[in-house]
Amino acid sequence: MVNDTIADMITRIRNANLITQKQVAVIASNTNKGIAQCLLKEGFIESIEYNTNSSNNPELILSLKYQGKKRKPYITALQRVSKSGLRVYTSYKDIPKVLGGIGIAILSTSQGILTDKQARMQKIGGEILCYIW
């Protein structure tokens, strides 16, 4: 049993990128679905499938994106920010820009899981879950 499903998801995506795997299966939770939707909207992954055929745990199947003949991953790095032992909260004014705006920060807000750009536009702060670039 995994205690931190977000960290598990980030690790699975990172490992799949290292071996240029086309798809990766992650645990299906509402938070992971929200993060996957943000990745899809920002163009870091190709598609999301919901798989309930596995034993008792439903899974999300993420199709990863690569560019060129050398299959360079669109996701260069993923970093977990807020952890179970140390939560990181921010107001909308203090949301950091990841690599000067090249990357994204994913936040858990009262309006759901949002990217840093969406949270700034809606003027909503929240818990910073991870950085992706």
Curated annotation (Swiss-Prot):
InterPro entries linked to this entry: Ribosomal_uS8, Ribosomal_uS8_CS, Ribosomal_uS8_sf
Localisation: Plastid, Chloroplast
Top-level taxon of origin: Eukaryota
An example molecular function term from Gene Ontology annotations: rRNA binding
GO cellular component: chloroplast; ribonucleoprotein complex; ribosome
Record's keyword terms, sorted: Chloroplast, Plastid, Ribonucleoprotein, Ribosomal protein, RNA-binding, rRNA-binding
GO biological process: translation
Main location (coarse class): plastid
Pfam families xrefs: Ribosomal_S8
Keyword Metal-binding annotated: no
PROSITE patterns: RIBOSOMAL_S8 (PS00053)
Classification via PANTHER family: 40S RIBOSOMAL PROTEIN S15A
Described purpose of this protein according to its UniProt entry: One of the primary rRNA binding proteins, it binds directly to 16S rRNA central domain where it helps coordinate assembly of the platform of the 30S subunit.
Family: Belongs to the universal ribosomal protein uS8 family.
Summary of subunit composition and partner proteins: Part of the 30S ribosomal subunit.
HAMAP family in alphabetical order: Ribosomal_uS8_B
Protein name: Small ribosomal subunit protein uS8c
Organism: Mesostigma viride (Green alga)
Gene: rps8
